[in-house]
């Protein structure tokens, strides 16, 4: 793969190019997204957090597990009444609405206008978050009528989106978060990271680009490079959580089992009885899902899923 092809997959305009390419990951054109949506992706679009004792709840879909992941991220963020909080790459706005219910002013920013429109449609009237289209790696002076002045926010959350930004975009996002935060403010960053210092190894682990082309990213940030960049910008790391096992490890096992079940006639009938939306997936697409989950497994073994709480010193 040439460097130009890799960079063409980067999702955010501020990172490399002027044309965002993230849309195909979330517009229903991939069978992976359609399967996840049928199994419960809705206002929240994250992998979920899977305690062993709660796994029987999977028959009701992914939503309870997605809420658990948001709850853990918000425990780290700890939004308080009267604070101003940015939900960066907010997707359909479910997390932003939860921040608003804490009494904080919540502003959800997303690159895709269709996500912002859906977030606004889903949001309750009271307390109502605000949403706007913006590239969080290159923030404008204002968004949705809200001024984005330096040091005008108390907290920033980025939940399971940084992997889309590309290496340059991740650094730019950290710099933008630093600029937006007041002294003493905090950034909670939840993301996939690469276990070692050689993220280019994904080329050999995902040689057909099944994983990268499905989810529109080039590579995961090495854990220590994330930390080094944050320190260089000025952040102090106040908390770290490794959620690899309850998030990506268990999700991998669950999704692989579902894909293999759907790849048989009897299995498809069972799954469609549980989640009728799965009937829209053709038999050949179930085979594609099996291949995709096999590729995911290779990438997962070289990855971790972590959360940071970074603070801008007062």
Predicted segments with their positions:
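N-terminal, positively charged/glycine-rich alpha-helical extensions of SAM-dependent methyltransferases
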Residues: 5-53
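Conserved alpha-helix/loop element of class I SAM-dependent methyltransferases that forms part
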Residues: 63-81
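Class I SAM-dependent methyltransferase SAM/SAH-binding core
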Residues: 86, 92-139
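A short acidic, Gly/Pro-enriched loop at the edge of an enzyme's catalytic core
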Residues: 141-156
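A short glycine-rich, Lys/Arg-flanked "PGG" loop and its adjoining helix->strand segment in the class I
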Residues: 171-186
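Short, glycine-/aromatic-enriched active-site segment of Class I SAM-dependent methyltransferases
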Residues: 192-217
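Substrate-binding/catalytic lobe of Class I Rossmann-like enzymes that use SAM or dcSAM, i.e.
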Residues: 211-276, 287-295
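C-terminal lobe and adjacent flexible extensions of AdoMet/dcAdoMet transferase-like proteins
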Residues: 277-314
């Amino acid at each position: 793969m040439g460097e130009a092809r890799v960079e063409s997959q980067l999702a955010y305009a501020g990172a490399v190019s002027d044309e965002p390419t993230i849309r195909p990951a979330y517009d229903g054109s991939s069978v992976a997204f359609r399967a996840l949506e049928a199994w419960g992706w809705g206002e929240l679009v994250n992998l979920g957090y899977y305690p062993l004792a709660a796994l029987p709840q999977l028959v009701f879909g992914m939503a309870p597990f997605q809420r658990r992941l948001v709850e853990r991220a918000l425990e780290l963020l700890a939004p308080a009444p009267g604070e101003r909080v940015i939900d960066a790459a907010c997707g359909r706005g479910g997390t932003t609405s939860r921040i608003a219910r804490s009494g904080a002013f919540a502003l959800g920013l997303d690159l895709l206008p269709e996500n912002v429109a859906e977030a606004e449609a889903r949001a309750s009237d009271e307390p109502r978050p605000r949403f706007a289209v913006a590239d969080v790696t290159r923030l404008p002076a204002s968004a949705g009528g809200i001024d984005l002045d330096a040091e005008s926010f108390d907290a920033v959350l980025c939940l399971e989106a940084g992997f889309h930004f590309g290496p340059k975009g991740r650094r730019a996002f950290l710099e933008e978060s630093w600029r937006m935060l007041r002294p003493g403010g905090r950034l909670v960053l939840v993301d996939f990271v690469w276990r070692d210092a050689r993220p280019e190894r994904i080329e050999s682990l995902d040689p057909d680009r099944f994983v990268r082309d499905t989810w529109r990213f080039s590579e995961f940030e090495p854990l220590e490079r994330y930390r080094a960049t944050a320190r260089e910008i000025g952040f102090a790391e106040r908390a770290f959580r490794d959620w690899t096992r309850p998030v990506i490890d268990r999700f991998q096992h669950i999704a692989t089992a579902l894909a293999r079940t759907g790849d048989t006639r009897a299995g498809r009938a069972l799954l469609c009885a549980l989640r009728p939306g799965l009937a829209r997936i053709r038999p050949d697409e179930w085979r594609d899902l099996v291949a995709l989950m096999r590729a995911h497994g290779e990438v997962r073994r070289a990855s971790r899923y972590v959360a940071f709480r970074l603070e801008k010193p007062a």
